[in-house]
Amino acid sequence: MSEAIFVEGLTKSYGEKTVVNHLNLSVKSGTVFGLLGANGAGKSTTIECILGTKQADSGTVRLLGQDPKKCRRELFQKIGVQFQEGDYHKEIKVCELCEETASLYRKSADWRKLCGQFGIGDKAKTAVKSLSGGERQRLFIVLALIGQPHLVFLDELTTGLDAKARRGVWKTLESLKEQGLTIFLTSHFMDEVEALCDEICILKKGTAVFRGTVEQAKAQCGCEHFEDAYLKLSDEEADE
């Protein structure tokens, strides 16, 4: 199985504060990988450095075998990124935003079908600003998938969704994974991580304190429940 993401020695500092500390990651194609950690652990900066939208101080990154800083245009056609919010015209409708997004790609998925899969098929004529928080979140996932990416980054993918909607998203993502999609996600929902992730990495103050599977994390910590293992490894309770 080939690598979709390869990261070696990734480091990023702001002044004297190191926010990503010599991070090493490897994500196999066709798998779901979870990057976990408390708020401020370095997850967002890590993703920005991996994507090349933020300049790392040092380290090597390969996405689908290519350097994201040198092959941005080509990788744009192969990688989807879920944005939490966007600077859209206040009156733009869901259908208009989807069509505009589809026009950016050489090949695009049927956005109507994607909207249906994510439970917003009846919102095509609705203004984006009128959607609920959960509906907007699902729309942003759809937008990340319109370009038929080989690899997609999903940041806090089901924040704002109720339990039924969350499980619907999980089911759709599992189906896309079976079709070969590689998914890199962040989440604060440990049941979501258990349901979706083949492998995880837990960050604590920019340093990877665990890499492996959910079962390995539980075994390492002697915990029956993954949430307990996560809290122990991340020290999130202590940080709070």
Regions found by a protein language model. Name each.
Residues 59-70, 74-75:
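Conserved ABC transporter NBD signature motif
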Residues 193-195:
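A short, surface-exposed alpha-helical micro-motif characterized by mixed small hydrophobic
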Residues 99, 103, 108-123:
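Conserved ABC ATPase "signature" region
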Residues 152-156:
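Catalytic Walker B motif of ABC-type/P-loop ATPase nucleotide-binding domains
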